Amino acid sequence: RSLLLIMAPDNLQANTVSDYVKFLRDTSPYINTHRGKTFVLALGGEAIAHANFTNIVHDIALLHSLGKKLVLVHGARPQIEERLKGSAISPQFDQYTRITDSATMVCVKDAVGSARISIEAKLSTGATNSPMHGARIRVLGGNLITAKPLGVREGIDFHHTGEVRRIDHKAIQRQLEDGAIVLLSP
């Protein structure tokens, strides 16, 4: 449920050019210090569904244009819950871990795929109606994370629920070095 909110000039209460120039002067040391650095941003499914999502995407595009290497890790819990509710499947959890049987997995795939497409589409439009309009942003992902099943724990079969086994750091780094934003889905 983490959001990184960036204060962009559009968000300022500045009424004068001198206020804008002061903002740029005040932020430029931070912009320069973090140029070429990798930022990992977590976007919960709540952020994707929020009315402010377009502004969040504009801020992500701005960070990218300032030379930041971005890895976006997104969630989809509310979208999954919505799909399960629509299919009359009762969600099952042990503690806070979803138990994903085959019927649930259909809803999970649909929700995660839809969330991913929404993020890619917003970023790929070049932030229409924003100062970042026309920016060429490439969003890449793939099978960069390998999972392993949780299996049966304390008598509970978690079916298709898993945890991270391996992350292909080298492939992620190559995509970042090539100027892409890396998008990682659950």
Spans of model-derived segments:
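Terminal amphipathic helices with adjacent charged low-complexity linkers/tails
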Residues: 78-80
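Glycine-rich loop at the start of a catalytic domain that most often binds anionic cofactors/ligands
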Residues: 52-58, 82-91
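Active-site glycine-centered loops adjacent to acidic/histidine catalytic or metal-binding residues
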Residues: 75
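Hydrophobic/aromatic beta-strand patches that form the interior of the parallel beta-sheet core
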Residues: 71, 183-184
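Short, basic, glycine/proline-bearing loop/turn elements
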Residues: 41-48, 155-158, 186
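Short, Lys/Arg-enriched N-terminal segments with co-localized hydrophobic residues
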Residues: 1-6
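N-terminal glycine-/serine-/threonine-rich phosphate-binding loop
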Residues: 7-71, 177
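Ligand-binding beta-strand-loop-alpha-helix segment within the catalytic cores
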Residues: 85-181
